[in-house]
Regions:
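Alpha-helical segment proximal to the catalytic Tyr-Lys
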Residues: 112, 156-160, 217
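Conserved glycine-rich cofactor-binding loop
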Residues: 11-12
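Substrate-binding pocket helix/loop in short-chain dehydrogenase/reductase
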Residues: 83-84, 88-96, 189
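A conserved structural motif in NAD(P)-dependent oxidoreductases
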Residues: 193-204, 215
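Short C-terminal tail/terminal secondary-structure segment
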Residues: 132, 209, 220-234
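Active-site helix of classical SDR
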Residues: 107, 143, 151
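Residue(s) in the substrate-gating loop at a strand-loop-helix junction
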Residues: 127
Length: 234
């Protein structure tokens, strides 16, 4: 059964892999992007998740073109790393606004239609860093940890309306965001991963597709780590 899916930040990296995976399963997938054209084979809508009006306009466009949004993957996010003592306040608040408050804006708008339909799938892309912490990433880690609390609160609040809310927590993924690591940092990273390799983006995408599927209808408030074991115990 084809569903209408919105993937925020779905024009590159993990988000693009998720969008392609869901489209391959027959869903009508719309990706948000901030500029340019959407990836080939996918529907696109311009949206900045830090702007409530833009989020509302994006949903209105999708609803008018494709129908009510049934599945949302809150993937859009940024990094602005820096040591705690040197991090300017706007580097902290900016990352929180995009990664955490942005997901809240999307969730609030998405659940209007989901509550009427008494069905919805909300999937938040967090990070192992949100569970373990990381030096130089206090802003990013806080934003990704916040998604867990958000998902579990939504799960409790809206579960009676047939809406599930779950989190996928990727570890180190082989994308352009990790391509700039130094050889030394990459060696350290590999040594910390029990499976001894980074993930491929499509491995994250398949986990998301499972949580979006009917097979996961009785799963809500869960955190699914896809991290090669690096975050085990958290």
């Amino acid at each position: 059964m084809s569903r209408v899916v919105l993937v925020t930040g779905g024009n590159r990296g993990i988000g693009l892999a998720i969008a392609k995976e869901l489209a391959s399963r027959g869903d009508t997938v719309v990706v948000t992007h901030r500029s340019g054209e959407p990836p080939e084979g996918l529907h696109g809508v311009i949206c900045d998740v830090t702007d409530s009006a833009a989020v509302d306009a994006a949903f209105s466009h999708v609803e008018s073109e494709h129908g009510p949004v049934e599945v949302v993957v809150a993937n859009a996010g940024i990094t602005q790393d820096g040591l705690l003592m040197r991090m300017p306040e706007d580097a902290f608040t900016g990352v929180l606004d995009a990664n955490l408050t942005g997901a809240w804006r999307v969730t609030q708008r998405a659940t209007r239609g989901m509550m009427k339909a008494r069905f919805g799938r909300l999937i938040y892309i967090s990070s192992v860093v949100g569970l373990t912490g990381a030096p130089g990433q206090v802003n990013y880690a806080a934003s990704k940890a916040g998604l867990v609390g958000m998902a579990r609160s939504v799960a409790r609040e809206l579960g009676g309306r047939g809406i599930t809310a779950n989190v996928v927590a990727p570890g180190y993924v082989d994308t352009d965001m990790t391509a700039d690591l130094t050889d030394k940092r990459r060696e350290e990273m590999m040594a910390a991963i029990p499976l001894g390799r980074t993930a491929q983006a499509d491995e994250i995408a398949k986990a998301v597709a499972f949580l979006a599927s009917d097979d996961a209808a009785y799963i809500t408030g869960a955190v699914l780590p896809v991290d090669g074991g690096v975050g085990m115990g958290h």
